[in-house]
Design a protein with these regions (language model features):
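Extreme N-terminal starter segment of soluble prokaryotic enzymes
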Residues: 6-11
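Conserved mixed alpha/beta catalytic, RNA-binding, or beta-rich assembly cores of soluble enzyme
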Residues: 14-32, 39-58, 62-107, 112-267, ...
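A mid-sequence interfacial segment
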Residues: 102-115, 318, 322-328, 332
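C-terminal non-catalytic interaction/assembly regions of soluble proteins
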Residues: 240, 252, 257-313, 319-324, ...
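Amphipathic, soluble alpha/beta structural segments
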Residues: 328-345
Length: 345
C-alpha cells in the first residue's frame, strides 16, 4: 500500500449554506499545489457516496455527522484502502477527521482545511493526541510503500508504550533523508538504527520484538519546464518552494525530468550535477501521446512546443506506470515545477 499525500478531493454538501461553503473551500484547495483536483457534489448523498467512495483520495462531507456515518457505513472496507473522510458543519466551526486519519491522510488534511476556514480541527487518533509519530505517518511523510500494513498496529502500540523500535537499512546505500527525518521528528519515540547488507537497498525494515514492517522507497521525480537560459539557481528557487510545500528533503529526490527539447538546457544539467541525481529527457512524441486525468495542459506550451504539458507529463512518464502527481504544475518566474511519485509494484 503506497502512502502519499491526498491529491483528488470530492466535497459533498446537503444544504444551500453547505454548498456555498464547498465553493469557498474549493477556491482555497485549488490554490494549493499539493491538491491536484477538487470536485463539488450536491445532495443525493447516499448515491453520491456509493459512486465516489473509491474514486477519490479524500471526501469532505459538509453535513451532520449522523448523515455522514449512515451513508458511509456500508462502504467501509479497510484502513488500507478507505479514502480519507472529513466532516464539517455548515457553519465551518469544526473540521473532524472521521476516517483514515493516518494511512488515508485525513488528519493532515483536517489541519490544512481547518486552517483555511479558520475552524477548530478535531483529531482523535491516539498517537496524535499523545504527540507521537505513528510509523504510518513516518511512511506517509517519506513517501514509502508499506508492504504489510496489517503490522502497523503493533508498532504504533509500541510507540504509545514508549518501547523501542528499530529501523534496519542496507549499509551500502545512503539513507540521509531517513536519518534527518528521524533526528528532527522523533524526539518522543525510542528509535535506533541498524545496518545490514542482507536487505534490498530500496527497502527499510522496521522491527519490534517478533514483528517486521517492510517499507519500500518509491522514486520521487521532479518534472521541470523552463524558459531558455534559466540558471540552476532560478530552477532551484522554484524547486525549494515546492519541496517546502511538500515538506520533502532534496535528499529524498530520485530523478529530474523534462522534455528532450530541453536536453541542452544548462540550468537543468547543472542542477542535476549539483543534486547528484540523474535527469531524464523524455521524447516529445511520448509527451504528445501521454494522457492522464492528472495533467493540467497549457495552451501556450502546446502552441510553442506541440505538447500540452512538459513538467507534469515528463515527471509522470519518468516515475513510471501507475505513478501519481504529488505536486501539480506550478510556475515560478519562468520555471514550472511538478513532482510525481512512483509505484514500483
Amino acid at each position: 500500500y503506497i502512502i502519499c499525500d491526498i491529491m483528488k478531493i470530492a466535497i459533498i454538501s446537503v444544504s444551500k449554506k453547505g454548498y456555498e461553503l464547498s465553493l469557498l473551500l474549493k477556491e482555497h484547495l485549488d490554490k494549493d499545489s499539493t491538491i491536484i483536483n477538487t470536485d463539488i457534489y450536491y445532495k443525493d448523498v447516499k448515491n453520491t457516496f456509493k459512486l465516489l467512495f473509491y474514486e477519490y483520495d479524500a471526501i469532505i462531507a459538509i453535513m451532520a455527522s449522523g448523515i455522514l456515518i449512515r451513508s458511509i457505513a456500508p462502504l467501509i472496507k479497510s484502513k488500507v484502502c478507505d479514502p480519507a473522510i472529513l466532516n464539517i458543519d455548515e457553519n465551518a466551526n469544526f473540521v473532524i477527521s472521521t476516517l483514515s486519519g493516518h494511512l488515508g491522510g485525513a488528519n493532515k488534511l483536517t489541519s490544512k482545511v481547518a486552517n483555511m476556514l479558520n475552524a477548530t480541527e478535531v483529531i482523535t487518533t491516539a498517537t496524535d493526541v499523545n504527540k507521537k509519530l505513528g510509523v504510518d505517518v513516518i511512511a506517509k511523510d517519506l513517501y514509502l510503500t508499506v508492504k504489510n500494513p496489517k503490522e502497523i498496529v503493533y508498532f504504533n502500540k509500541a510507540i504509545l508504550n514508549n518501547e523501542e523500535i528499530i529501523f534496519r537499512v542496507n549499509s551500502k546505500e545512503n539513507y540521509d533523508f531517513l536519518f534527518d527525518y528521524l533526528n528532527e521528528n522523533t524526539l518522543e519515540i525510542d528509535v535506533s538504527i541498524e545496518f545490514t547488507s542482507s536487505i534490498n537497498t530500496d527497502e527499510i525494515h522496521v522491527l519490534y520484538k517478533n514483528h517486521k514492517l517492510i517499507m519500500k522507497i518509491e522514486d520521487i521525480v521532479v518534472g521541470i519546464g523552463c524558459r531558455r537560459g534559466k540558471s540552476k539557481e532560478d530552477i532551484l528557487t522554484g524547486l525549494d518552494k515546492a519541496l517546502d510545500d511538500l515538506n520533502i528533503s532534496k535528499k529524498r529526490l530520485s530523478k529530474l525530468a523534462s522534455g528532450e527539447i530541453k536536453k541542452e538546457e544548462t540550468g537543468i544539467l547543472d542542477l542535476s550535477k549539483m543534486l547528484n541525481i540523474p535527469v531524464n529527457f523524455v521524447e516529445m512524441d511520448k509527451l504528445t501521446l501521454f494522457k492522464s486525468e492528472d495533467i493540467h495542459e497549457s495552451e501556450f506550451v502546446k502552441s510553442k512546443f506541440g505538447v500540452g504539458s512538459v513538467s507534469e507529463a515528463s515527471a509522470l512518464i519518468t516515475a513510471g506506470f501507475d505513478s501519481k502527481l504529488i505536486y501539480k504544475k506550478t510556475a515560478f518566474d519562468g520555471v514550472t515545477i511538478a513532482l510525481a511519485v512512483s509505484k514500483k509494484d
